[in-house]
Regions:
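Protein kinase catalytic-loop region centered on the HRD/HxD motif
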Residues: 19-31
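Activation segment signature within eukaryotic-like protein kinase domains
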Residues: 15-16
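Activation-loop N-terminal segment of eukaryotic-like protein kinases
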Residues: 43-47
Length: 214
């Protein structure tokens, strides 16, 4: 994005959809990524997105303690992850993913969530004519970036429905992923390791990967 500029709205939706499906499957195992940002989403030679870096992933039922790894990515970390006993969950990944989509669409790093708690003057997608998404889609991304967790979509499934149902994309992608998602769900916590191994395999095979923010 730094090299070529923002990505067209429909193309962003196409590229990010498999990531939403993957996160939905991961969340069903009770695992939250907690570190989604452009730095951790790579693009391969087929322009497919690969989510990496599960080093901060945690079981949803865990509470934050001083011994747990906490990473803050300016513009992409929801406010609850800054608090020692923040109530984080799937909605936290929703925030980070929608903030990443915002960057892909605009080339602008979103305002920091903690700063937005004091004064929220983030520029809305609907005020940027070049985005070329429907009002429903733009509002869905901004809702996913709501500062307060209870105002966001509470799951990747609800975010997906808001973004894709009007385009008729949801069922088609669900069918495509169905045979793969079963093995992911059965794997439980091993899904994290599987994701890391998948990236390693791409690198070993010589697949060229670059961060979407580069």
């Amino acid at each position: 994005i730094k090299e070529h500029g923002p990505i067209a709205g429909e193309r962003v939706l196409q590229m990010i959809h498999p990531v939403i499906k993957a996160l939905s499957a991961i969340h069903k195992t009770g695992i939250i990524h907690r570190d989604i940002s452009p730095d951790n989403i790579l693009v391969n030679q087929k322009e497919e997105l690969v989510l990496i870096d599960f080093g901060s992933a945690r079981a949803e039922r865990q509470t934050m303690t001083q011994s747990m790894t906490v990473l803050f990515k300016r513009g992409y970390t929801p406010e609850e992850q800054y608090r020692g006993r923040g109530n984080w969950g799937a909605w936290s990944d929703v925030y980070s993913l929608c903030a990443t989509m915002y960057f892909m669409l605009t080339g602008i790093v979103p305002n920091e969530s903690i700063e937005r708690m004091i004064h929220d003057d983030i520029k809305l997608l609907r005020d940027m004519p070049h985005i070329r998404l429907s009002a429903t889609e733009e509002d869905a991304i901004m809702r996913g970036m709501a500062v307060k967790a209870n105002r966001r979509f509470q799951s990747m499934e609800s975010l997906e429905a808001a973004l894709y149902e009007s385009r008729g994309w949801v069922q088609r992608v669900v069918l495509y992923f169905q045979h793969k998602s079963k093995s992911v769900l059965l794997a439980g916590g091993a899904v994290v390791l599987a994701g890391v191994l998948a990236v390693c395999a791409l690198l070993t095979m010589g697949g060229k990967l670059s961060a979407i923010g580069s």
